[in-house]
């Protein structure tokens, strides 16, 4: 099911999401924007896209970055071919982070639970609520623990 959420992304974020979608890249929205989409709006100074680490997806992500107009001098396909990479484009409050791993959750277990949300007219895949809670709990940062607690209340309300 696609759920609408208008005017959430700035133009850079929307353009990057559109480029990933157009390239056919496998990705999910994670981080603070995913927290907001799942019902707990909060301030964040970047956007986090979790991309599947694989050779095939790496080619698609690089194509998306080229289409987006990202500076590619220090970025290669190999950066997206294995876990534990973070590629940052731009500076806060418009920074885009492309991650190949998130704490506490593996791609293969999260992908079937991703939900597609209509964000600014784009069908954006978002990490599932349960996986987002696990990710936030695993990170160990105080703000992520607060996010997890708020998301758990939202999950309880949905299950009531």
Where are the language model's segments positioned?
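Compositionally biased terminal segments of proteins
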Residues: 1-160
């Amino acid at each position: 099911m696609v759920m609408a959420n208008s005017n959430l992304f700035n133009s850079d974020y929307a353009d990057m999401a559109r480029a990933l979608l157009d390239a056919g890249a496998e990705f999910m929205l994670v981080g603070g924007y995913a927290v907001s989409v799942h019902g707990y709006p909060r301030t964040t100074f970047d956007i986090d896209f979790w991309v599947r680490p694989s050779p095939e997806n790496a080619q698609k992500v690089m194509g998306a970055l080229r289409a987006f107009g990202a500076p590619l001098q220090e970025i290669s396909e190999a950066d997206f071919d294995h876990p534990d990479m973070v590629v940052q484009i731009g500076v806060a409050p418009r920074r885009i982070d492309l991650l190949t791993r998130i704490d506490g959750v593996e791609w293969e277990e999260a992908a079937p639970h991703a939900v597609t949300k209509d964000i600014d007219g784009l069908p954006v895949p978002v990490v599932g609520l349960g996986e987002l809670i696990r990710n936030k709990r695993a990170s160990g940062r105080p703000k992520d623990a607060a996010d997890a607690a708020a998301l758990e209340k939202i999950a309880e309300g949905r299950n009531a």
